[in-house]
Amino acid sequence: MKLMGIGDEAGGGLDSQITATRELGWKHIEPRGMEVPGFAKANFHEIPDAAFDLAVKKLEDAGLSVYCFGSTVMNWAKKVGDPFDITLGEVKRAIPRMKRTGAKYIRIMSFKPGDDEFQTPPEVFRRVKDVTNMFLDQGLQPVHENCMNYGGMSWQHTLELLDKAPGLKLVFDTANPIFNPDRSRPKPWPRQDAWEFWEHVRDHVV
């Protein structure tokens, strides 16, 4: 078992993320948002090349390896109506950086649904499948997080997404079901049951 955490949940700056990870005795980190000294805060796959090079060196010097990228690909800040070029650009920037750091996994999502939506549009399936294939073709494994996204609307929606995007795997956030409605049920939607969700998707979690 490898223990790690998402860096920016310990602090915005790279140095504080490294400090927290080392204090826990962990050897791995999942970088997401990051402020490298001298550069504005951005996602690890979006920071300038010079900032990325500096971050990689600092992580290596600290004895930390990058196990997974906490990306912004199709996350809850994006909608399926946004130009797909935004997503494709993020994927194309992430791939060489994953290879540089030796990371095999990348956390992705499936766009934020509208407040009253309870079905996943075909375009979401198409985009997630395309993104999944882009990573798999490079020997990298995308993992979908259950969050405020179409695939996270219920465990049934998650399994439907996996069926439509062969090769996609999951990362399970135990806290997210607590504040997300179960859109597989009639309105008014109850909150999701984290244990029930886990029981149905656990075989697909890496």
Model region roles, listed by residue range:
Residues 115-131:
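Glycine/proline-rich, positively charged
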Residues 1-104, 129, 136-137, 169-171, ...:
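N-terminal pre-domain/capping segments
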Residues 98-119, 138-152:
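Active-site groove signature of glycoside hydrolases
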Residues 78-84, 118-120, 153:
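Conserved glycine-rich "GG(E/T)P / GGGxP" loop and the immediately following alpha-helix
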